[in-house]
């Protein structure tokens, strides 16, 4: 059997822990062959690993012992493995065994001089893997064998931080006794106390406080107290308020933020606790009549119904039994305390909007979502999901015969243009490892823009409103964004392969779309734009495979393209004209009835057909014209 084929069997035996089968497969093989077989990297299930790595990953100590003691396999081999949905590049057998909780394999590897401080591509150590998994026995063994507890990963996230976040109190206690720094800061500015507070691990918060963990702000201006309040971790908030030496303002804002967060949190919704904590905070503000701590309230915001936040116990008492007012009060309080640029402000706004949409209260939903969208764009956050959410709710409204305001569509189109503009800039300056997702998001935004254009064609617009919508379409058309295949907006509008989101959107939008194509053309879309294969929109539409049942769409698009100056004799990179690319007799007939070849087109085709030299003989604009033919 060839070595390539045999390597697969060797890997399978190691992965399944079949030590006798593995030994039999390697019997009578030469040393170079054995070295090759045991160092071959096999790709399987998204992993790239050697027999040693997969055996360690799966906890097969007998296989690991055989490979190390009999075949002297390099204990420092690295591969790519999957753990809890994460892909780990550069992992050793020791990292895998530690992360998977295989204590005997860990001991075996360390006894064969595996490097306990070897780091993966993201600077993760075997000790960090064990802390993630919460295996105190492995953590203790590694530390006793010189594992460095201070090595942080590439985000400066320490072993103590991951153990605190995952809730492994015994590991946290052990690391602190081994002098792990409770005040080390991650790249985002957070400490172990931030992570424990966010996750609501009360015992760990108590332990960290005992070890003098400081109440510092992270990169978003959040203390562990604020993080706990924002995450609805009431017991942690109360513990920190009892132990930390915070001023009156911090104490009051923690109670207000906790109450406000209970009002609009999908997982922790509790309107009773909302009022309870807001009322406690209000009492704190009015505790000393000679020194009332007044709120610095936000100016009224349209999304919140132009409400002003309650400023005294009487105003708060007046909304006790009005849950809708309490929901909005919660959103206003959160935005005041966290600041409009905080990354967490928008999520509850979106949630509350979704609840309104579920209850058919679309106007309130759209106001809230527009506010959240503007906050996220102001903070330069990625908004492709927010934009799609609007296409979905507008489609739902149209499907239910609910009126959609053209002004709302225009505002979302405007935000969509901005997001696509930013997306183009991100693509031109890619930041690894986000390059692929940046391109994915960019294409999603192009599709969403087309959904919004399609929705605009089904929305009642006044004579004053239509030009406002057209202005946003014009802006994007002249940016000329492209897909990875080089398709323009017009290509997508006439392509039956353009994907349509299936949550409400496909009830209203479909492609090819004659109204969308016409509107794009009216706003200046180039009817002779070509993709990477040299195909024009006309090349695309003539391949539509529903020419009978959707004849009107096919006919209208071909007419619109030709009347706007689409060249019916234009060739793609395979030298095929739209007529050559037609896949049905109907599209052929429609094309032939529209073909009005100019003398200029005939001359260009003759030049190309007879290979007459024309480069540098005619004006550059004419050269491009000839090349199209």
Swiss-Prot record:
The record's Gene Ontology cellular component field reads: Cul2-RING ubiquitin ligase complex; cytoplasm; nucleus; ubiquitin ligase complex
SMART domains this protein is in?
ANK (SM00248)
Q: Which windows of the sequence hold TPR repeats? A: 346-379
The UniProt keywords, alphabetically, are: ANK repeat, Apoptosis, Cytoplasm, Nucleus, Repeat, TPR repeat, Ubl conjugation pathway
**Where is this protein found?**
Cytoplasm; Nucleus
Identify the metabolic or biological route this protein is part of.
Protein modification; protein ubiquitination
ANK repeats at which positions? 47-77, 89-118, 122-151, 155-184, 188-217, 220-250, 485-529, 533-570
GO biological processes: apoptotic process; proteasome-mediated ubiquitin-dependent protein catabolic process; protein ubiquitination; regulation of DNA damage checkpoint; ubiquitin-dependent protein catabolic process via the C-end degron rule pathway
Q: Which PROSITE patterns match?
A: ANK_REP_REGION (PS50297), ANK_REPEAT (PS50088)
Domain of life where this protein originates: Eukaryota
Q: Name one GO molecular function term.
A: ubiquitin-like ligase-substrate adaptor activity
Subunit notes for this chain? Component of a CRL2 E3 ubiquitin-protein ligase complex, also named ECS (Elongin BC-CUL2/5-SOCS-box protein) complex.
Q: What does this protein do?
A: Substrate-recognition component of a Cul2-RING (CRL2) E3 ubiquitin-protein ligase complex of the DesCEND (destruction via C-end degrons) pathway, which recognizes a C-degron located at the extreme C terminus of target proteins, leading to their ubiquitination and degradation. The C-degron recognized by the DesCEND pathway is usually a motif of less than ten residues and can be present in full-length proteins, truncated proteins or proteolytically cleaved forms.
Question: Family, per the entry?
Answer: Belongs to the fem-1 family.
Protein name stated in the entry: Protein fem-1 homolog B
């Amino acid at each position: 059997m060839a070595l390539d084929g045999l390597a697969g069997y060797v890997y399978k035996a190691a992965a399944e822990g079949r030590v006798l089968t593995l030994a039999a497969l390697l019997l009578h093989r030469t040393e170079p062959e054995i070295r090759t077989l045991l160092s071959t990297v096999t790709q399987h299930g998204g992993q790239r690993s050697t027999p040693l790595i997969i055996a360690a990953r799966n906890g097969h100590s007998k296989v690991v012992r055989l490979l190390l003691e009999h075949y002297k396999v390099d204990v420092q081999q690295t591969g790519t493995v999957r753990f809890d949905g994460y892909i780990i590049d550069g992992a050793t057998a020791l990292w895998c065994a530690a992360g998977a909780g295989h204590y005997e394999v860990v001991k075996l590897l360390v006894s064969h001089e595996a490097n306990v401080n070897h780091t993966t591509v993201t600077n993760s150590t075997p000790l960090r893997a064990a802390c993630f998994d919460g295996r105190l026995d492995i953590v203790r063994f590694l530390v006793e064998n010189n594992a460095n507890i201070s090595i942080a990963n590439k985000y400066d996230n320490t072993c103590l931080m991951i153990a605190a976040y995952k809730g492994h109190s015994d590991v946290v206690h052990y690391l602190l006794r081994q002098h792990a720094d409770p005040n080390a800061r991650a790249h985002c500015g957070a400490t172990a106390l931030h992570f424990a507070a966010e996750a609501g691990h009360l015992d760990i918060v108590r332990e960290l406080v005992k070890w003098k963990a400081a109440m510092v702000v992270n990169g978003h201006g959040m203390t562990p107290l604020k993080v706990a309040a924002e995450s609805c971790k009431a017991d942690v908030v109360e513990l920190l308020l009892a132990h930390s030496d915070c001023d009156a303002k911090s104490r009051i804002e923690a109670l207000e933020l906790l109450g406000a967060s209970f009002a609009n949190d999908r997982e922790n919704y509790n309107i009773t606790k909302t009022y309870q904590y807001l009322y406690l905070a209000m009492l704190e503000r009015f505790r000393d009549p000679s020194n009332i701590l007044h709120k610095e309230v936000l100016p009224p915001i349209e999304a919140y119904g132009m409400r002003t936040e309650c400023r005294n116990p009487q105003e708060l008492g007046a909304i006790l039994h009005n849950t809708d007012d309490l929901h909005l009060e919660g959103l206003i309080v959160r935005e005041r305390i966290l600041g409009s640029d905080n990354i967490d402000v928008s999520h509850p706004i979106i949630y509350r909007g979704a609840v309104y949409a579920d209850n058919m209260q679309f106007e309130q939903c759209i106001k809230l979502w527009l506010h959240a969208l503007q906050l996220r764009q102001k903070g330069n956050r990625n908004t492709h999901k927010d934009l799609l959410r609007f296409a979905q709710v507008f489609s739902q409204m149209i499907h239910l015969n609910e009126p959609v305001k053209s002004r709302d569509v225009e505002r979302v189109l405007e935000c969509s243009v901005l997001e696509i503009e930013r997306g183009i800039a991100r693509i031109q300056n890619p930041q690894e490892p986000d390059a692929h997702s940046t391109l994915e998001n960019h294409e999603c935004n192009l599709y969403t823009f087309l959904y919004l254009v399609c929705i605009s064609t089904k929305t009642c617009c006044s004579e004053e409103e239509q030009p406002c919508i057209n202005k946003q379409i014009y802006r994007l058309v002249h940016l000329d964004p492209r897909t990875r295949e080089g398709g323009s907006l017009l290509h997508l509008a006439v392509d039956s392969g353009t994907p349509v989101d299936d949550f409400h959107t496909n009830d209203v939008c479909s492609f090819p779309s004659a109204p969308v194509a016409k509107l794009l053309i009216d706003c200046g879309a180039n009817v002779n734009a070509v993709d990477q294969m040299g195909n024009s929109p006309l090349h695309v539409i003539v391949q539509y495979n529903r020419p009978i049942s959707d004849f009107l769409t096919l006919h209208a698009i071909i007419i619109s393209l030709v009347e706007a100056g689409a060249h019916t004799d234009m060739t793609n990179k395979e030298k095929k004209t739209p007529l050559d690319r037609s896949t049905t007799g109907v599209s052929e007939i429609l094309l032939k009835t529209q073909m009005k070849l100019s003398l200029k087109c005939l001359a260009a085709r003759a030049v190309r057909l007879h290979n007459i030299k024309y480069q540098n003989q005619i004006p550059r604009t004419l050269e491009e014209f000839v090349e199209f033919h």
